[in-house]
Amino acid sequence: MYKLEVQDLHKRYGSHEVLKGVSLAAKAGDVISIIGSSGSGKSTFLRCINLLEQPHAGKILLNGEELKLVPGRDGALKAADSRQLQRMRSRLSMVFQHFNLWSHMSALENVIEAPVHVLGVSKKEAIEKAEHYLAKVGVAHRKDAYPAHMSGGEQQRVAIARALAVEPEVMLFDEPTSALDPELVGEVLKVMQDLAQEGRTMVVVTHEMGFAREVSNQLVFLHKGLVEEHGCPKEVLANPQSDRLKQFLSGSLK
């Protein structure tokens, strides 16, 4: 059984179709990197998986359980069961490009927020878990700091700890290093590599070709809302079949 399965996902904005039937399947421990040019639909696809964006067609399954979707007035699909959506979202955590930490909360408070208020974990247990994950990503010493007083790399590592604190079955990363200064990228990629080596199931939208090649076991190249190529990262990157991917890599691959 797949941990995460997305079938024939479509999304449009007005008459512009951003996703034209994208499918993806991740087994336990898979690390899938999604690459592509700006505007290819990468981030939209990721955001549709947990309904931050509403798709217009397709199926989303987590551990074989299908997310129940019904058409809304605008034609987009919405959750038919809000409790199911909340439960599935807690098993499908997301790390955002711009961190999305609560500015009025400390690092520790950011990490315990969802376990306490969404999952109903006791505050004592949530704090113990938060301190564990903050230490795991190397920012235990910053637990009382507020986002404005942290570097971008520290904020993103706190965001990863926050995502881990709900004990997710699948982690989604939306260009987690693209908002960072170049010297801070490595510290975040190292945390992600460690998570991959632990056997975490991860779907990563990224421009970091080294990570895609060395850490992922699947690579997806999206172009204009369609999967142009999909396969073993080292093989796809070393021997691209499509002219579009060759052109993309000529400007991206270091």
UniProtKB/Swiss-Prot annotation:
Subcellular location: Cell inner membrane
Binding-site residues, ATP: G36, S37, S38, G39, S40, G41, K42, S43
Membrane topology listed for this record: Peripheral membrane protein
GO molecular function ontology, one term from the record: ATP hydrolysis activity
Keyword Coiled coil tagged: no
SUPFAM superfamilies: P-loop containing nucleoside triphosphate hydrolases (SSF52540)
Gene3D superfamilies membership: P-loop containing nucleotide triphosphate hydrolases (3.40.50.300)
Ranges of residues in domain ABC transporter: 4-249
Keywords per UniProt: Amino-acid transport, ATP-binding, Cell inner membrane, Cell membrane, Membrane, Nucleotide-binding, Transport
SMART domains assigned: AAA
PROSITE patterns, per the entry: ABC_TRANSPORTER_1, ABC_TRANSPORTER_2
Xref: Pfam families: ABC_tran
Any one annotated GO CC term: plasma membrane
Similarity comment: Belongs to the ABC transporter superfamily.
Function field: Part of the arginine-inducible binding-protein-dependent transport system for arginine and ornithine. Probably responsible for energy coupling to the transport system.
Name assigned to this protein: Arginine/ornithine transport ATP-binding protein AotP
Lineage: Bacteria, Pseudomonadati, Pseudomonadota, Gammaproteobacteria, Pseudomonadales
